[in-house]
Amino acid sequence: MINTIEGFFMNYQPAIEVVRGGTVESIHHAAIAVVDPEGKLVASWGLPETSTYMRSSAKPFQVLPLLEAGGASRFDFSLQEIALMCASHTGTDAHVRIALSIQEKVGVSEGDLLCGVHPPYDPETADRLKQEGIEPTANRHNCSGKHSGMLAFARLIGAPLEDYILPEHPIQKRILKVLGEMCDLGGEEIRIGVDGCSVPTFAVPLESAATAFARLADPGSLSQSRADACRAVWQAMTTYPEMVAGPGRFDTALMSAAKG
């Protein structure tokens, strides 16, 4: 991890210059890794081995154990519901409806979520709730889909619903193992922090994260069950990009414009 200014400039190199009137106004640094599904580095900028927290970009991998264990068929999850489990959503009424649907199928409630509460990211929804005097609840949290998926996995394997956010909980141990396999890393090579929604978050080398995403998009080299889970995630997110974020959000707009 980078702990000094000197370390930052070693790992990240100038990538974009913003020019105004012939004068460079700002410089944006980056570390970039382009990797194929076999883990081969194809292109890079800066240091591709730079370690960084995946944060919400890990969500598609955090749902893989649930799908690989047969959770989609056990609970009859729709693609919309799987997309929400991978989402940093904006808390619209549409997102809340899907979160409630997941919870009803699993047999849990909004009160079981340990993600906390914040106002919806969607400005129109936030303004409406404020005008109506309605306090936001946990399902408005951008990570409510992910947490609902984690509760589903706990229910599926017969693990306690309580404390599902702790690193030592069986579902979090399984998530760490699967992420390590997707990244070609051992669990001891992954640094664990606490994400903003209270679950573990993972610091990995940039090229390792890129390997995981390359395999998510092209899972042909993976086991059948893992490949099927990856394809389900890919199909869900690209079919329902509005579930992954929401109206006016960059990732939803990009997936919609690029058809995936």
Q: PLM features: residue spans?
A:
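Active-site SXXK
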Residues: 54-72
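Short, contiguous, pocket-lining structural segments
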Residues: 24, 54, 139-147, 166-171, ...
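Active-site-proximal alpha-helical segments within enzyme catalytic domains
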Residues: 200-219, 229-236
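A short glycine/serine-rich beta->alpha loop
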Residues: 45-53, 85-89, 133-141, 193-200
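Beta-lactamase-like hydrolase cores
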Residues: 2-49
